[in-house]
Amino acid sequence: NIINTLMDIKNHLLNLQPSSTLAINEKTKELESKGSKVYKFGFGQSPFPIPSDIVEELACNASKKEYLPSKGLLELRIAIAKNLKGKKYLFDQNDIIIGPGTKELMFLLQIAFDGEIILPIPSWVSYFPQAIINRNKVHFLETNFEDKWHLTENKLKEISDKIGNKKKLIIMNYPNNPSGTNPKKIEELSSW
């Protein structure tokens, strides 16, 4: 590997594989370039055109070249805090971080978190490699068809007892594809 000869790479990173979703997307583009008809069911990219009012707004702001605040646009954070306050959540703009996407925000969360991660399976393909990069210990929590791929209080208690008194972060991929869930189920788990 040319990178390994140019610089030393941390051992725990040497066996990381490329993102499977991006690898699949690259493979579909390769097949399409060779004339194959490909039906994409896995990549989370919308097949719908961008609404014209959004395109116009982006064009109006294309000349802005300043770095954004590290927590995101203040006006947007204030608007989100106001919206949450209307729903009885007590956050202000300083409690809110705007990011370029969920994957990046989940990565930052795992960098900051000092504890062990509970990862229900199946889950989004990026969370486990992110944990490896951040040297977080991961405990997989198997879900099953009978429970509609949802966490159950019994399984959560079992894995929590195994981890003990260490801090725990549960990365929940809900609403779960394809089965979905409802807020009441998540509230029940969070109260546990």
Describe the residue ranges of each PLM region.
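N-terminal small-domain helix-loop-helix segment of the aminotransferase-like
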Residues: K10-G101
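Short glycine-rich anion-binding loops that position phosphate/pyrophosphate groups of nucleotides
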Residues: S46, K103, Y174-P178
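Short beta->alpha connector loops at strand-helix junctions that form conserved
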Residues: I121, F140-F145
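A short helix-loop-beta submotif of the ANL/AMP-binding
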Residues: I133-V138
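Active-site phosphate-binding strand-loop segment of PLP-dependent enzymes
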Residues: T143-W192
